[in-house]
């Protein structure tokens, strides 16, 4: 696609990235791994999504045209590769997750080879009406070689279970989110006792800054096998379904973007007690 657009209009395209000019090692960094960002979420649903962003210092017209060319080539490529795309999706949906170690927390990973990034210069000007300063792009382009952090690697994993058991007390809250995401689950009609893996909470931290009207939470603790009294009305959520990876990300206690992180299970999270999902 990059070559096609270059031949068509003479413009250069590359993977989304930023230069951390205030902190971090110099390099080309992609954006956040968490599924709160739409295309990451779509990927968790075993579908494909493309982030499209135009260069910040391009003119409005250039940004519109750059986006148009990019979207056109994406659609052309998807149409040409539709059979391969369908096969990839079908394979992803058929993978059994039970017993797999999947990531719950991540960090950027550096690519093995450095990349050449086209850079430009700007000059600082002052707005004659407001007096505030702003940047204006200069007509200069040069290439800078730098490392690229274009993907992520897990810093912590958890083993995916065959299914989760959601305590009856938390069933209405968790069930509402599962319904929103289109996850399949069932309800236990008769109480019994089962040997399950329980996550026992030893501590919890809460972000000091509010984000979207919540304070993000992190749980700490340990897992062990124990006999649990499973009440009528508890939920069974299998990972053997097309949305199994999404189920895992939502319900794991240490997930960096699940229900715990979004403070939706706070009333059940006390040190010394079990996380209400087994």
Q: Where are the regions that the model predicts?
A:
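Structured catalytic-domain cores with a bias toward divalent-metal coordination
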Residues: 1-278
């Amino acid at each position: 696609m990059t070559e096609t657009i270059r031949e068509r209009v003479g413009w250069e395209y590359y993977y989304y990235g930023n230069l951390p000019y205030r902190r971090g090692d110099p390099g080309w960094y992609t954006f956040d791994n968490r599924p709160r960002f739409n295309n990451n979420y779509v990927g968790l649903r075993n579908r494909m999504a493309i982030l499209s962003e135009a260069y910040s210092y391009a003119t409005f017209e250039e940004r519109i045209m750059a986006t148009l060319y990019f979207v056109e080539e994406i659609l052309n490529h998807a149409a040409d590769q539709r059979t391969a795309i369908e096969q990839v999706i079908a394979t992803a949906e058929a993978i059994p997750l039970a017993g797999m170690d999947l990531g719950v927390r991540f960090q950027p990973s550096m690519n093995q080879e450095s990349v050449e990034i086209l850079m430009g210069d700007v000059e600082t000007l002052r707005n004659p009406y407001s007096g505030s300063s702003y940047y204006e792009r200069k007509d200069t382009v040069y290439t800078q070689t730098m490392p690229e952090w274009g993907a992520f690697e897990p810093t912590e994993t958890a083993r995916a279970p065959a299914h989760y058991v959601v305590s009856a007390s938390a069933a209405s809250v968790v069930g509402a989110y599962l319904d929103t995401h289109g996850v399949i689950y069932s309800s236990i009609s008769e109480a019994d006792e089962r040997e399950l893996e329980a996550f026992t909470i030893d501590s919890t931290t809460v972000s000091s800054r509010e984000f979207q009207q919540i304070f993000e939470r992190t749980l700490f603790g340990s897992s062990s096998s124990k006999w649990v009294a499973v009440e009528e009305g508890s939920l069974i959520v299998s990972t053997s379904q097309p949305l199994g990876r999404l189920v895992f990300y939502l319900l794991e206690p240490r997930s960096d973007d699940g229900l715990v992180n979004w403070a939706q299970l706070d009333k059940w999270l006390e040190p010394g007690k079990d996380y209400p999902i087994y």
